[in-house]
Structure formats: C-alpha cells, structure tokens
C-alpha cells in the first residue's frame, strides 16, 4: 500500500526537496506551509498530492491539518518536520517575543505534530518520523543560544519519543544539517564559512533529503541523530 507522507515546512528548502523525493517514489505527499498559495505552488512543482496551510505554533491548525490529510489521503505513515525559523542574536539582545517564537515553532510545534501523527501510526501499527534538527543543537554557536536550545531540545524529545513508541513499531529519528543552501543561509559569508567545512562546500537540500528518506525507510534505525554537515562538526 502506498505510504502517506506529511511534510511540514514542505514548500521550501530541505522540506521541499524531501517532498519532491517522496513524490518521485510514488508516495502520497502532503506539502504543508504557513502560506497556502506557496504550498500549492510547491506541491504542483514537486508532484505532491495535497497542499495545506498550517501555523505549527497553533495547535488547532495542526489538528485541522491532520484531519484534512486523513480525509484526502488516509492515515499518515511518514511524518517529516522541517518547519523552522531563525532569530539570531546574543542572548542579552534577544527579544522575549523571539524566544517564544523560536521555541514555539521549532520545538513545541514539532512536538504537537508528532503527537497528532502518532494517533494515525498507532492505528496503522507502524510509522516513521524524521525531525530536522541542526548541527547547532549538537555543538552550539555564538548568537544562536535560543535556536540551539530549540534544536537540542528536539533531539532530546526525539530520542525519548523513540523509546516510548518503539514497541508499536514506530521509529523516530533526527537529521542534523550543517550549512545547506536554503533561505536560512542566505546572507551568510559562504566563502569564509566554507573554509570550516572539510568537504569544502555548503550542502544542497537534495543531499539532506536523501538522508531523510534513508531514515524513513530504514526499519531497524530509531533514536538516531544523522549529521549531514560535510564534516563541519569536526571543526567546531
């Protein structure tokens, strides 16, 4: 039976590359973005089956999104959480509203989508979740204390959840990218930052998508953090 895949943040960057790769493998893909028109455009481009809008900081919108997916495609088998934001600043200069936004979107939103997806997966007696973290969650970085906290929190959450649901044949893993060519890395000084990467370049979203697919389809891997960073962690 064809798998149903929900990709939050699936309209751009890594999420879009994941949506495209899953669609190419003939999975039923729902592309989810805050902006419905952007989601529709991305879904049409990558060959997805459904486009939906959802603000993951709002629990009621997440609930409505899963209802739409179930009604249109069926129960969710695979969940990919790629929705995220960045608000870089030294902690003393970080606004309280930015702290709340970062934690709400990057961490709490992912927790809520996982909670809703589990209901479908338990009915299906199996499933897989891949949450997109960051090398910053592993190693830390100046000016990204809250962002790093949200991503490291995601790792702790994912490992704990993997233990909770393993007996139900549900797997939970994390992909932690380094410097990847996406909207989030626009404006960075690529020439100087590339010198920190042993492989000598930024990665492409498609390379991260391959790692996500690997974890979704690997039946004996759970609770794992797969770092995709060109060796950046070796230098940090």
From Swiss-Prot:
InterPro entries assigned to the protein according to its UniProt record, in alphabetical order: NAD(P)-bd_dom_sf (IPR036291), Sc_DH/Rdtase_CS (IPR020904), SDR_fam (IPR002347)
Entry's EC annotation: 1.-.-.-, 1.1.1.-
Chain residues that bind substrate: 134
Binding site for NADP(+): 11-14, 34-35, 55, 82-84, 147, 151, 180-182
Pfam families referenced in this protein's UniProt entry, alphabetically: adh_short_C2
Classification via Gene3D superfamilies: NAD(P)-binding Rossmann-like Domain
Described function: The heterotetramer with HSD17B8 has NADH-dependent 3-ketoacyl-acyl carrier protein reductase activity, and thereby plays a role in mitochondrial fatty acid biosynthesis. Within the heterotetramer, HSD17B8 binds NADH; CBR4 binds NADPD. The homotetramer has NADPH-dependent quinone reductase activity. Both homotetramer and the heterotetramer have broad in vitro substrate specificity and can reduce 9,10-phenanthrenequinone, 1,4-benzoquinone and various other o-quinones and p-quinones.
Family from the record: Belongs to the short-chain dehydrogenases/reductases (SDR) family.
GO MF, one annotated term: 3-oxoacyl-[acyl-carrier-protein] reductase (NADPH) activity
Example GO biological process: fatty acid biosynthetic process
Chief site of localization: mitochondrion
Organism of this sequence: Xenopus tropicalis
Keywords from the named record: Fatty acid biosynthesis, Fatty acid metabolism, Lipid biosynthesis, Lipid metabolism, Mitochondrion, NAD, NADP, Oxidoreductase
Annotated PROSITE patterns: ADH_SHORT
Entry GO CC: mitochondrial matrix; oxidoreductase complex
Subcellular location: Mitochondrion matrix
Pathway: Lipid metabolism; fatty acid biosynthesis
Name of the molecule in the record: Carbonyl reductase family member 4
Active-site residues, as the UniProt record annotates them: 147 (proton acceptor)
Subunit composition and interactions: Homotetramer (in vitro). Heterotetramer with HSD17B8; contains two molecules each of HSD17B8 and CBR4.
């Amino acid at each position: 039976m064809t798998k149903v895949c929900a990709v939050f943040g699936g309209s751009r960057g890594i999420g879009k590359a994941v949506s495209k790769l899953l669609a190419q493998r003939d999975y039923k893909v729902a592309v989810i973005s805050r902006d419905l028109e952007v989601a529709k455009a991305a879904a049409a481009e990558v060959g997805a089956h459904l486009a939906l809008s959802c603000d993951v900081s709002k629990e009621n919108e997440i609930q409505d999104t899963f209802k739409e997916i179930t009604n249109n495609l069926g129960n969710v088998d695979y969940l990919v959480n790629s929705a995220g934001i960045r608000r870089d600043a030294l902690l003393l200069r970080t606004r309280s509203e930015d702290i709340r936004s970062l934690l709400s979107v990057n961490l709490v939103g992912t927790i809520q989508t996982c909670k809703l997806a589990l209901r479908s997966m338990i009915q299906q007696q199996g499933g897989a979740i891949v949450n997109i973290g960051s090398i910053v969650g592993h190693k830390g970085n100046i000016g990204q204390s809250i962002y790093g906290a949200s991503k490291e929190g995601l790792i702790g959450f994912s490992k704990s959840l993997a233990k909770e649901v393993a007996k139900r044949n549900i797997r939970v893993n994390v992909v932690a990218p380094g410097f990847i060519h996406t909207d989030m890395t626009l404006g960075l000084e690529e020439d100087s930052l590339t010198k920190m990467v042993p492989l000598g370049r930024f990665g492409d979203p498609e390379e991260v998508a391959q790692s996500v697919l690997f974890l979704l389809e690997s039946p004996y891997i759970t609770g794992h953090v797969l770092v995709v960073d060109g060796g950046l962690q070796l230098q940090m």
